[in-house]
Amino acid sequence: MKHFDVVVIGGGHAGCEAAATAARMGVQVALITLRKSGLGVMSCNPAIGGLGKGHLVREIDALDGIMGRAADEAGIQFRLLNRKKGPAVQGPRAQADRRLYREAVQRLLAEQPGLTIIEGEVVDLQVNGGRVQGVSLADGTSVGAGRVILTSGTFLNGVIHIGDQRRPGGRMGDDPSQRLAAVLGELSLARGRLKTGTPPRLDGRTIRWAELEMQPGDEDPVVFSFLNRVPKARQIACGITHTNARTHQIVRDNLSRSAMYGGHIEGVGPRYCPSIEDKIVRFADKEEHQVFLEPEGLDDDTVYPNGISTSLPAEVQEAYVRTIAGLEDVRILQPGYAIEYDYFDPRELRPTLEVKALGGLYFAGQINGTTGYEEAAAQGLAAGLNAALSIREREPLHFSRSGSYLGVMIDDLTSRGVTEPYRMFTSRAEFRLSLRADNADQRLTPIGLDLGCVSDARRESFNKKRELLEKGRALLEGSSFTPSQLNELGIQVSQDGMRRTAFAVMAFGEEAASAVARGVEGYGDLPEEIRQQLAKDGLYAQFILRQEEEAAALKRDEAIRIPADFDYAPLSGLSSELKAKLMRARPSTIAQAAQLEGMTPSALTLILARLRRAGRDAAAV
């Protein structure tokens, strides 16, 4: 029987990242997947990154993960989302060529020393003395393991729904994992059903592109990996169109034939990626919904219509799609479908992602109730690191909420659990001002260097960047200006006679940063990337101090009581999701409110402010 230090089950985004990460830590790893050719497949949308998600990809890359590098090789349109908002919430996103992404992932895995890829289906876990010892394959093969990481995606008891038709499937074209699901059921872990969906795939040759609005990528594309500077593939534009009243009427007339609305699905779907059926029902007053037509590759005529995922019958899909401008003659290559699958309550896990009830077994990805490639890959990285550290008998790595979005996600999952597919947003992070996408390497690469999971090339690149940042910060801190000097530079400040360092002046925004570059000798010679990061550091410096003070104050305020009839509706800063959960749960204290799934310190601060205002009003009567 072959034996490996770590065995990873599943070759999706979580599995690939887990296997590569554990191998970088110097342990022997086996990645078991149904088909080697399926490694790196993008099962749903052909894109990486986005709001919150792009931050996760940067954090994965900072620890030398593979997702960012693969996305840079395959990216055919890069856009920085939220570009008009503050730097902290700007998220890099890339539309990817499916083939190029798959090939990049497979090459990166093949080049990784210590990683063996095995084709097969895992059907059982070998357990002895309360610890997992290995796995059994469908062909009778046994593989020994010191640690096992399960990244099953949507395969556990997966069922594909198209209208009233249902069939077993982990995704279109692949069988589900039923025998392993039965084995996991014997562990008595809390489990549930979730669902996700995908839109029909379109033949781009039958789309009237000339009639559509086209959206190009950014002129100054922001890539994912800190080792790269520019995209590697040819860049293209996407099409934009919209649904209309006819579209909505067809969907409305056939809601009973939808798998979701026809009662065929019990699993809960992702709130922030609704199907076209959900959009028509939940947003009945909207006259149209935007649809992005995303080519799936440079040499592929398939188009992904982002925004119309569905579980309606194939003939209904064809009818409503052809009411959309530019798609009147379109041919559907593959119908959209919903997929329902098992997940396990992530509160059954330690913060290392190890299962509490069975030592040596780790869960990562959609099995933990998350949705999205990026969330899965980040969990895979965390599980791979901790499994390897455990093999080496080293201290586990606990990602903190204050240090990474990865830490926010794992803490949310393991302490609050999920009732619907969990997606990362910047609003989930109370320390988001310091958790920017551009400084992920400064936050996490030092940890990777200490752990030994970072390549020599990344070490060299990181050290060079850190030296430049330190040099730039010293120049800024060592230069100061009087109010008169600042006025001469075009920066209007109070004439209070106080000198201000150049770093402090960064808080006044982009124009001030540009003026400082002209006023500090040697600063303008630094690379643009370094000056941009220092400007963001200065911009947020005072806010971050205040943020830390608020977090400390929240800790002190946990015992404050919330009236049973407290009205959350007027709190405009709360999301509708949080308002609904608060009104349903009716927490009696701030501490109880803090434990709700999706709760954030900023939301707690809003509630506290309203409670204090109500208290002052009552005292004044």
From Swiss-Prot:
SMART domains: GIDA_assoc_3. GO terms for cellular component: cytosol. FAD binds at G10, G11, G12, H13, A14, G15, V122, S177, Q366. Its cofactor is FAD. PROSITE patterns: GIDA_1 (PS01280), GIDA_2 (PS01281). Keywords: Cytoplasm, FAD, Flavoprotein, NAD, tRNA processing. One of its GO terms (biological process) is tRNA methylation. It is found in: Cytoplasm. One of its GO terms (molecular function) is flavin adenine dinucleotide binding. Disulfide bonds: none annotated. NAD(+) binds at residues 269-283. Belongs to the MnmG family. PANTHER family: GLUCOSE INHIBITED DIVISION PROTEIN A, PROTEIN MTO1 HOMOLOG, MITOCHONDRIAL. Homodimer. Heterotetramer of two MnmE and two MnmG subunits. HAMAP family: MnmG_GidA. NAD-binding protein involved in the addition of a carboxymethylaminomethyl (cmnm) group at the wobble position (U34) of certain tRNAs, forming tRNA-cmnm(5)s(2)U34. This is tRNA uridine 5-carboxymethylaminomethyl modification enzyme MnmG. It comes from Cereibacter sphaeroides (strain ATCC 17029 / ATH 2.4.9).
